[in-house]
A protein has these predicted regions:
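Short, Lys/Arg-enriched C-terminal cap helix and immediately downstream tail that follows
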Residues: 88, 127, 132, 167-181
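Short, charged helix-capping/linker segments at alpha-helix termini
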Residues: 1-3, 15-24, 34-53, 156, ...
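DNA-recognition helix of helix-turn-helix
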Residues: 73, 80, 84, 146, ...
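Sigma70-family region 2
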Residues: 15-16, 39-42, 53-70, 89-91
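Structural recognition of an alpha-helix C-terminal capping motif at a helix-to-coil junction
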Residues: 35, 49-56, 69-81
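Internal acidic/polar
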Residues: 3-4, 85, 92-117, 144
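Arg/Lys-rich amphipathic alpha helix in sigma70-family domain 2
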Residues: 63-67, 77-96, 113, 165, ...
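A short pre-motif secondary-structure segment
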Residues: 134-138
Length: 181
């Protein structure tokens, strides 16, 4: 039995009231959900909160899951949406922290690197959610175009188009900051 078909079986059991089946799904996907949130938020406590919210939403909406799609993609999309919601709740001066979680820049990091990092963070935060999501999924999570399309619920061509547009918008935002040639 593949993990996909096993997930569908677990979802059906959950919908039938089997709490142990839901516990199995939580154990199977808790690291995936937490890491997805952590990569977007770069805050361990906030990522834990988002992960809890994700599993609550998953439990409440299991009846809406369409087994034609991978459960992984469905839950990852919920995690991504909840992470974006958490980013929006932050104060405007806070943003997408690209440092290692809870990490401070090391002594080897030069002022120029720090300025470039801060400039990129500011530029990313100027992007609309749909563009920021593709940049984060591709360049920070390392998703394939196919996986991104499934997670975002759009065709692969749309993913590529959004990523192209996002890169152009990032380039313009960085130019406004005097960060590119």
């Amino acid at each position: 039995m593949t993990e996909d078909s096993d997930d569908v079986t677990l979802v059906r059991r959950c919908c039938g009231g089997d709490r142990q089946a839901f516990g199995t799904l939580v154990v199977r996907y808790q690291k995936t959900v937490y890491n997805a949130a952590l990569r977007m938020l770069h805050d361990r406590e906030e990522a834990k909160d988002v992960a809890q919210t994700v599993f609550l939403k998953v439990y409440e909406n299991l009846g809406k899951y369409d087994p034609k799609f991978k459960f992984y993609s469905w839950i990852y999309r919920i995690a991504l949406n909840e992470s974006i919601n958490a980013l929006q709740r932050r104060r405007p001066t806070e943003g997408l922290d690209l440092d290692a979680p809870d990490g401070e820049p090391g002594p080897e990091e030069s002022l120029g690197q720090r300025q470039a990092h801060d400039g990129l963070q500011r530029a990313l935060m100027t992007l609309r959610e749909e563009y920021r999501a593709v940049v984060v999924l591709r360049h920070f999570v390392g998703c394939s175009y196919e996986d991104m399309g499934e997670i975002l619920g759009v065709p692969e061509k749309t993913v590529k188009s959004r990523l192209f547009s996002a890169r152009q918008l990032l380039r313009k935002a960085l130019q406004k900051q005097g960060m590119t040639q």
